[in-house]
Design a protein with these regions (language model features):
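Nuclease catalytic cores that cleave nucleic-acid phosphodiester bonds
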Residues: 95-192
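Domain-level signal for Mg2+-assisted phosphodiester chemistry and nucleotide/NA-binding surfaces
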Residues: 1-105
Length: 192
C-alpha cells in the first residue's frame, strides 16, 4: 500500500468506527427529535466539521482525508455520499476554504478495519511531509500501537472519539465525535 504524496495535515478515518458512531447518533437524535427530518448526514459537512474542530491552522488550506475500510463494508450509514470505495482513485474538492483530497484504502481480507487503520497510521508517522494527524478512531489496536511504540505519540495528534467510553489510555487532545455528527445533521448547539 502506497499512501502517495501527503499534505502537512491528514485526517485518518476508521470507517467501521465512523459508521458505528453515525448510526448510533442518528438513531439517538431521531428518537430525541421525532419531528425533525434527520435522514441523511452530509459527509463533506462532517469532514469540514472535523477540520474546524481540530483547529486546523488558517494557513493550512490543503488537507488529505484517508479512509481505512474493509471491501465488504464500504458503505456509510445514512450518509451522502455514502460509499468510501468511490474515493479509491482520489477526489479533490473544495470544502469551503479548504482544498481536500479524499482517498480510501481497503484492508486485506484477513484484516480488521481497526488493524488496517493502525497500519496506515504507522505509515503516516513515518512520512516526513505529515506534521499533524487528525484521527477518527477508537480501538484497542490503536491503543496497543501507542503502548508498544510510544514514538507514535510524537506527531501532533488529535482525536475524534466518545467522551468517556474509550479504548485510548493516552493523553491525546480530542473532541466528542457525537458533536460533529449532530452539527452535520444540522442540529443547533443547544440540541446536542
Amino acid at each position: 500500500m502506497n499512501l502517495g504524496k501527503l499534505n502537512k495535515t491528514v485526517i485518518l478515518i476508521d470507517t467501521d468506527y465512523l459508521n458505528q458512531k453515525i448510526k448510533e447518533n442518528i438513531e439517538f437524535y431521531r428518537d430525541l427529535y421525532p419531528d425533525k427530518e434527520l435522514n441523511t448526514l452530509n459527509l463533506y459537512q462532517l469532514i469540514y466539521n472535523f477540520i474546524v474542530n481540530a483547529r486546523v491552522e488558517s494557513d493550512e488550506r490543503n488537507i488529505d482525508v484517508l479512509f481505512a475500510y474493509r471491501l465488504s463494508d464500504s458503505l456509510l450509514y445514512s450518509t451522502n455520499p455514502g460509499n468510501v470505495w468511490n474515493f479509491a482513485n482520489a477526489e479533490n474538492l473544495n470544502i469551503k476554504e479548504f482544498n481536500v483530497t479524499i482517498r480510501s484504502f481497503f484492508a486485506d481480507e484477513d484484516e480488521s478495519c481497526s488493524k488496517h487503520f493502525t497500519i496506515m497510521f504507522k505509515m503516516l508517522h513515518r512520512s516526513n511531509s505529515v506534521d499533524r494527524v487528525i484521527m477518527v478512531a477508537d480501538s484497542k489496536d490503536l491503543n496497543n500501537a501507542f503502548q508498544f511504540s510510544p514514538e507514535l505519540l510524537e506527531k501532533n495528534l488529535f482525536l475524534f472519539r466518545d467522551d468517556h467510553d474509550t479504548n485510548i489510555d493516552f493523553p491525546i487532545n480530542f473532541v466528542n465525535i457525537a458533536y460533529m455528527i449532530a452539527q452535520s445533521l444540522g442540529l443547533d448547539r443547544g440540541e446536542w
